[in-house]
Amino acid sequence: MHSLRLILMSIQLLCYLLLCPVDATSHGEATSVSTVLPPSKLGYQMQTSDKPLSCQMLLPKSLPGFTYMPPVSKFLVGLALRNALEAAGCQAEVWALQLQLYRLGGVEATQALIHHLQELQKSGHTDREVSVDALSSALQLLAWEQPGPKRAKRSISNTDCDNDQEQSVHNVVDLLPAVGTYYNLGTALYYAIKNCSDKAKERGRDGAIDLGYDLLMAMVGASGGPAGAVITAALKPAMKAGVQRLIQYYYDEKEVTTPQPEVTTHQPETGKDATTDIGVVEEIAMSNFVSEVESTTSNWEWPLLKNYGVLAYKR
């Protein structure tokens, strides 16, 4: 009986020794997966001065004051950084951010804008001479429209434009063509909202800010051909109205800050020539176009545009 007991104790001890390393190893693996993102998942994992670049650093919420921004500003910055995250291989963060964009702009419009922005980036862009100062003022005017606590508005207008962590992220991603372009666009808009015009101009170089202008035009159907019509039809009404006001503010601010050449036209009634400020002509043309977009997207066109959007942008 004593011998049998010794045998059983030996078997138990052996099982303990064999099973404990397995449990310890499995627990160790679970911990490492939850705290450290493997390089294969990061895509472009590069070293900054003191620590590796992580996907979390590319999220909009890593930018101070982003939480207090109005919906249109959040949508524009988030859309650009969403594409930067995708180009960097951060799939989990892409999906989480995309769900937030869906709530702001609508599913179909967001998908169409993601695709449209990718096409703009691939095809290149021309120098449209977009005024960063005017865009910055327009974004701030739109921000001050939003209801909310005054402390939030003060956070948005904070003029402290130096952020060492964000600058270190920029120094790395700026070397990566696709990631850098989207990141520069997102942060150019972000700094414009914060009234950091010099920083916004720096990030908007090489046409990055032009992408933002083209994106705004597509959101009101003023560019992009059929794609623009699809986007403006699918965009949530509140978001579309906000973008329309932003564009109107932009042209108003540009007219004030930029000397405009005059256009000479002949008046048959008087037989004399009349001069008109070209800025006024552009503003009237844009206002008329926006009105046409709103009035011509009738109910019977909606199913056709919706089907076109699904076919054109389903990925």
Swiss-Prot record:
InterPro entries in alphabetical order: APOF
Gene Ontology cellular-component terms listed: extracellular space; high-density lipoprotein particle; low-density lipoprotein particle
Signal peptide residue numbers: 1-24
Stated name of the protein: Apolipoprotein F
Keyword Cytoplasm included in the entry's annotation: no
Subcellular location: Secreted
Propiece residue ranges: 25-154
Family, similarity comment: Belongs to the apolipoprotein F family.
Tissue: Liver.
Known role: Minor apolipoprotein that associates with LDL. Inhibits cholesteryl ester transfer protein (CETP) activity and appears to be an important regulator of cholesterol transport. Also associates to a lesser degree with VLDL, Apo-AI and Apo-AII.
Pfam families: Apolipo_F (PF15148)
GO biological process, one term: cholesterol metabolic process
Disulfide-bond pairs as recorded: none
Keyword Repressor: no
Keywords: Cholesterol metabolism, Cleavage on pair of basic residues, HDL, LDL, Lipid metabolism, Lipid transport, Secreted, Signal, Steroid metabolism, Sterol metabolism, Transport
